Amino acid sequence: MRKFATYQAYPMRIIVLATLLLTGCQGAYFKTMEKLGYHKRELLVASVKDARESQEEAKEQFQSALEKFRAVLNFKGGDLQEKYDKLKAELDSGESRAAAVRERIEDVEDVAEALFDEWQSELDQYSDENLRRASKKKLDETRTRYKQLIKAMKRAEKKIDPVLSVFRDQVLFLKHNLNAQAIASLQDELVSIETDVDSLIREMEASIREADAFIKEMG
């Protein structure tokens, strides 16, 4: 089990949580967090917030990478190596942002699964049928809303790798062809890359809106 970004908010508990991580025991993690006053519902909201933030950062990163690529293609003189280095740095950052997005989505799935399993099992503990029905209705609504959220997040995530692949190709080509002729040969790629990045941004923004709505409903 990975370290949820939520840990960063609780520095006093790092040693305890690190121990749990070493055991790889998800159940022990949740039990310990509940003893510390953090229940699965709160952990799910925190994980969704972390995932939302990672997608916002990834969106900004790819916008920045596109700008750096345009700067290389619009090269009119000066230090071409410097522009290449900046583009390569943007690609490296994009790779890191992409990994963070994937990890945060997995964190959301881990907590959601634990929450819904617990919630479902607790329905049998009710003696009051009206309360049981009300709880089940809320569970079904939350699960439906969650499915919409995770679908949007994964749809956005799937757009990342194709964009990274294109940027990776351009950077690799430029690495050994830092000259005006090589740059000119990449001009035809710009429209395609812009289209891919724009599509990614739209999916990211849709996912972020879903996260905002989910957080609001869970609050």
Residue ranges and their predicted role:
Residues R2-I15:
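Bacterial N-terminal signal peptides that target proteins for export
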Residues R104-Q187:
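Extended amphipathic alpha-helical interaction segments
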Residues K40, S47, S54, Q61, ...:
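Long, heptad-repeat alpha-helical coiled-coil segments that mediate oligomerization
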Residues A28-G94:
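Immediate post-signal-peptide N-terminus of mature secreted/exported proteins
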Residues M33-L36, F69, L73-K76, L80, ...:
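Amphipathic alpha-helical membrane/lipid-surface binding segments
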Residues L22-G24:
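C-terminal motif of bacterial Sec signal peptides marking the signal peptidase cleavage site
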Residues A28-M33, S64, K68-A71, E103, ...:
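Compositionally biased, intrinsically disordered terminal targeting/sorting segments
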